[in-house]
């Protein structure tokens, strides 16, 4: 049909971006320029919200809501990741640009971009098995070969990602998705919103650590301490995921024992592992959780170890015989954390198709598992106020400009080079433009100061408040000399991380807003040199929109709706192609000012000090009546 839009789809496993099954789109024997192929691929990947139906909400995160949708023309089922924060569009664009360049069976497949009211929303493939965390918490029996295959899939995806010069920084069992097939399960790695270029450590360069970001339960100890870190932080997170696979317990320290220095408590963890667990699999998980980053093996070696362990596993048949040899381990066994396994585990019975952890129900939050001793275990994440028990997500703010991550392998380092940090090129970027101030021009200062005089330390238990706009450029009050700059977001702690609310304790008038299904707190980094604000102002101040979602009060029905700020195409979905002549995203006309400027009217109503005591002066007399 003439004028019919081509169906939305992503490139195949062997296709390059912009190429379809028939080549570049010009027929056999006709070559097309690369700009044409890039333009065709970009336009065919664009969609609108009206192009989909049968939306079903299947999840929600800190920044987005996930929907299962079906394309009306092609009938293809996909996942629409709707961005909730307008200020998070830079991170969304970075994730879209990175996923558009990744092609691997164990990396979540990118399908296209949905543009709606100036916002970008990613379209990915639908995984019918949910997340790995959901699979492990279900009563689904998982044999050891199945768990080894899942671990191998994740390791292969991360090996491919690291080979491209990028590391994940937020690898969790929540971000690993599972596909159910007739032959078994397949795991893929998703959620690349915090991915970063692998830093190259060289001598003689400035040491500047990367931002402290990620989910605390899976973050490496060096990241939580604010030290220099690299792609080996993903290896530690992978070790925590392996512990979840082996014991089928959540990563919460109430179930997965941890040490006070954020390491793995190996003796306590061994009490959760059955005798049928393959010993090399257990040792590999312990090795990945090593406290020293340099002793953790890269994913090229981890995938080899997992393949060797799988070769030693017998087939899932009742008459299978146990193997005579165990899988060789070439990694350094001295890198095991304190209290490593001192005794060899008994060889598992290969006739069992189900592991010992499958025979018990998933742990209940009301009854944490017993670890075989009478010692009181302490959650190390609850000892630091900035981590709030670990049930938050650490983010980097302000959002970086949308610059494509270079997909080039990192230069190999010799063993004699010292791990010195250089500032990645992706960090040297101009600041993003601040949003226009939408506050009332002549609003009095009293309501803004009243928040510091509230009786309670916590915010009011009302609904969501209006997000705080950046109005620093138009502030009439100069900064007093000799004082440290005040924090616009929250108070900087000793570890230069500040929190917005707690997610580990029930709500009270002094602990923050009420809890919901999603993790209610988002932690952002603050510069180390900022001082504390007086009067505990940070407990009542709102963070920027890039850190926490705030919704504005709904305007009256008669008021015109203010359109979202348009996003120019050279910096959004077509940014990687650098087309200066193309503009695909809608740019609505500027909105009319929401409030009247009352500066002229308010001037006559103000009573200035010193003038109210003057006696009234007589005015001119009116002429008298004449006969």
Swiss-Prot record:
It is found in: Cytoplasm; Cytoplasm, Perinuclear region; Cytoplasm, Cytoskeleton, Microtubule organizing center, Centrosome; Cell projection, Lamellipodium. Residues 421-525 are annotated as: Required for interaction with YWHAB. The active site is at residue 170. It comes from the Eukaryota. Residues 1-36, 316-373, 436-485, 500-519, 532-565 are annotated as: Disordered. Its main location: cytoplasm. Residues 52-309 form the Protein kinase domain. Residues 11-30 have a biased composition (Gly residues). The modification Omega-N-methylarginine is found at residue 338. PROSITE patterns: PROTEIN_KINASE_ATP, PROTEIN_KINASE_DOM, PROTEIN_KINASE_TYR. Expressed in testes and brain (at protein level). Residues 528-625 are annotated as: Required for interaction with PARVA. GO terms for cellular component: centrosome; cytoplasm; cytoplasmic vesicle; lamellipodium; perinuclear region of cytoplasm. Gene3D superfamilies: Phosphorylase Kinase, domain 1 (3.30.200.20), Transferase(Phosphotransferase) domain 1 (1.10.510.10). GO terms for molecular function: ATP binding; metal ion binding; protein kinase activity; protein kinase binding; protein serine kinase activity; protein serine/threonine kinase activity; protein serine/threonine kinase inhibitor activity; protein serine/threonine/tyrosine kinase activity. It is an enzyme of class 2 (transferase). Its cofactor is Mg(2+); Mn(2+). Residues 316-330 have a biased composition (Low complexity). Autophosphorylated on serine and tyrosine residues. Dual specificity protein kinase activity catalyzing autophosphorylation and phosphorylation of exogenous substrates on both serine/threonine and tyrosine residues. Regulates the cellular cytoskeleton by enhancing actin stress fiber formation via phosphorylation of cofilin and by preventing microtubule breakdown via inhibition of TAOK1/MARKK kinase activity. Inhibits podocyte motility via regulation of actin cytoskeletal dynamics and phosphorylation of CFL1. Positively regulates integrin-mediated cell spreading, via phosphorylation of cofilin. Belongs to the protein kinase superfamily. TKL Ser/Thr protein kinase family. The extracatalytic C-terminal part is highly rich in proline residues. This is Dual specificity testis-specific protein kinase 1. The lineage of its organism: Eukaryota, Metazoa, Chordata, Craniata, Vertebrata. The gene is Tesk1.
